[in-house]
UniProtKB/Swiss-Prot annotation:
Segments of this protein annotated with the region RGG-box 2: 161-223
InterPro entries, sorted: Gar1/Naf1_Cbf5-bd_sf, H/ACA_rnp_Gar1/Naf1, Transl_B-barrel_sf
Protein name stated in the entry: Probable H/ACA ribonucleoprotein complex subunit 1-like protein
Species name: Caenorhabditis briggsae
Residue ranges, compositional bias (Gly residues): 181-221
Start-end of Basic and acidic residues biased regions: 168-180
Quaternary state and interactors: Component of the small nucleolar ribonucleoprotein particle containing H/ACA-type snoRNAs (H/ACA snoRNPs).
Example GO molecular function: box H/ACA snoRNA binding
Length: 246
């Protein structure tokens, strides 16, 4: 009856199951747990298809929601699945349960395709439900809590630090023109097109085209300093002897 199960523990009766625990009876199952088994919400990577937190198979099915709303109409079948046109004006969750109007479950959303403004989805049917039983225009329903506003998938207009603006990843923000590793990635250096220190095309210290150490054709680098060794000041020159010509 510990407050929190240990890492790799069973989590039985604990307030929160351990990492890798079974989560049996715990308030929240462990990482890799059963996602269920009496727990309120399973851990990372667990089961619980249709449970409170969604996820994999074998968890507690809470049954149909209190309310369902129209999400789309049947368009055509594709092998054992059905394809529907979204008429809700919102975007459904992946793996969200789909129902008839009487809250009988039809299946679960498998794929969503199209643009934010005009899209559709495919449904993997529940056992015993046949794709051949649907007619064109048959209505399908969903829990309203499984819908997202379409604005989340539209580009942000004006101000803020949205993508492509002056913010992170933008033209002049963090991740500007001279970025690390990328064509215009974040920071300096790291092999970028105009990278700085590490292997950049016009970079600085380490092995760059005009770099310093190791490969400076006429500069100050160690090893391979062509100019200094030729003039007698380098490592391989004989600086103590002078040849006298009459």
């Amino acid at each position: 009856m510990s407050f929190r199960g240990g890492r790799g523990g069973g989590g039985g009766g604990g307030f929160r199951g351990g990492r890798g625990g079974g989560g049996g009876g715990g308030f929240r199952g462990g990482r890799g747990g059963d996602r269920g088994g009496g727990g309120f919400r399973g851990g990372r990577g667990g089961g619980g298809r249709g449970g409170f937190g969604g996820g994999g198979r074998g968890g507690y099915d809470q049954g149909p929601p209190e309310e369902v709303v129209l999400v789309g109409v049947f368009s055509h079948k594709c092998q054992d699945d059905i394809v529907c046109n979204n008429t809700s004006g919102k975007i459904p969750y992946f793996n969200a349960p789909i129902y008839f109007e009487n809250k009988e479950q039809v299946g679960k959303i498998d794929e969503i395709f199209g643009s934010p403004g005009e899209n559709g989805f495919s449904v993997t049917l529940s056992q015993g439900v046949k794709a051949s039983s649907f007619k064109s225009g048959s209505e399908l329903y969903i829990d309203p809590g499984k819908l997202l506003p379409v604005e989340r998938f539209l580009p942000q207009v004006g101000g803020g630090r949205g993508r492509g603006g002056r913010g992170r990843g933008g033209d002049r923000g963090r991740g500007g023109d001279r970025g690390r590793g990328g064509f215009g990635g974040r920071g300096g250096g790291g092999g970028g097109f105009r990278g700085g220190s590490r292997g950049g095309f016009g970079g600085g210290d380490r092995g760059g085209f005009r770099g310093g150490r190791g490969g400076d054709f006429g500069g100050r680098g160690r090893g391979g300093d062509f100019k200094r060794s030729y003039d007698g000041g380098g490592y391989g020159g004989n600086s103590n002897k002078r040849t006298k010509f009459d």
